[in-house]
């Protein structure tokens, strides 16, 4: 029997890319590939890329440049670029980096076996189509090998919102939702492999409308179906749009015990002028009222958000409106970025904010968000939380897991095993994690 071929995958960007990388590795496993943690001994290298920000795209070209020596030493080494940079830039990748053998978009990776075979003959292969066939239907059922206690599961892809700053509609395509039975089957397979927590993924996941036995089902209805799976203890979902936060989903946060009290609900800005120019289709006030309704259903829910500062034509007054919104909502965690021009998006054609001013605003916003995050973490001290243990800690006898609220929790002298869901009393908080002790 010949030795297995080795596959190195490097993943950039969002959780969906993590999921896609897993599926690509499984797909190429049928061609005799096993994963390796280093590119040096790989027979094939795949970079699964992100195109949300300019720096993310440039990192890919920088990484490819580092493989030139490796390709010279191993001419048969196959190098591929997948994901959203592949979709957006296509042939340009091969022009800038001729060492690349194949380029595959996020809707085409089910065809990787055929692409890999063609690349093995010396042919340059490009596949960035939006095929009519459903890639999930073409992917093989996931393997039965044991895995860690948490998993991502893509249920929806693409976006129809066309925010003025965003490339997702162009790189991932229109919104599509997977049929309910396919999602449930994959979830059951994951639970059989040891998974106890599943995070449902979508670029606009709460717009989910997958086909069910009696017509399309909402995300809330899908969650209630997942709730019936024995052995699945926790359900999360990300990322959501405020306009698709429907009543039944809000209600599920208050009544479904498996749905965790954590919600990532980006707002991007607090100025109605900027929100309109972003094409967000909601106002700051409607977002705040929505948060109030969600907290009425689940008072202890932790809200997470995304923010962009320095969006074209943003004034100091506009930025102050964002700070005001942050102070009113009080986020448990949030992600903030300086606006990054993406070619082909409407915002790229508008008057840009001075970079130094944008940097200053980002620092000021992050200071407020960091304070709020620490206040929320400090409020956990003394509470008893459920913790799903995921890995051993850095110190002997230490275990690390995630709380209901997605905080990392470190427990010393811990007899819990990976995959155990235990009650923990929080005894202290740090900058990015909590420390606790087992109470059962």
Curated annotation (Swiss-Prot):
It catalyses: N(6)-dimethylallyladenosine(37) in tRNA + (sulfur carrier)-SH + AH2 + 2 S-adenosyl-L-methionine = 2-methylsulfanyl-N(6)-dimethylallyladenosine(37) in tRNA + (sulfur carrier)-H + 5'-deoxyadenosine + L-methionine + A + S-adenosyl-L-homocysteine + 2 H(+). It comes from the Bacteria. [4Fe-4S] cluster 1 binds at residues 14, 50, 84. SMART domains: Elp3 (SM00729). GO terms for cellular component: cytosol. Residues 5-121 form the MTTase N-terminal domain. PROSITE patterns: MTTASE_N, MTTASE_RADICAL, RADICAL_SAM, TRAM. InterPro entries: Elp3/MiaA/NifB-like_rSAM, Methylthiotransferase, Methylthiotransferase_CS, Methylthiotransferase_N, Methylthiotransferase_N_sf, MiaB_methiolase, rSAM, rSAM_horseshoe. It is found in: Cytoplasm. One of its GO terms (molecular function) is N6-isopentenyladenosine methylthiotransferase activity. Residues 378-440 form the TRAM domain. Its EC number is 2.8.4.3. The keyword Acetylation does not apply. [4Fe-4S] cluster 2 binds at residues 159, 163, 166. It is an enzyme of class 2 (transferase). Residues 145-378 form the Radical SAM core domain. Its main location: cytoplasm. Keywords: 4Fe-4S, Cytoplasm, Iron, Iron-sulfur, Metal-binding, S-adenosyl-L-methionine, Transferase, tRNA processing. Its cofactor is [4Fe-4S] cluster. Binds 2 [4Fe-4S] clusters. One cluster is coordinated with 3 cysteines and an exchangeable S-adenosyl-L-methionine. Catalyzes the methylthiolation of N6-(dimethylallyl)adenosine (i(6)A), leading to the formation of 2-methylthio-N6-(dimethylallyl)adenosine (ms(2)i(6)A) at position 37 in tRNAs that read codons beginning with uridine. Belongs to the methylthiotransferase family. MiaB subfamily. Monomer. This is tRNA-2-methylthio-N(6)-dimethylallyladenosine synthase.
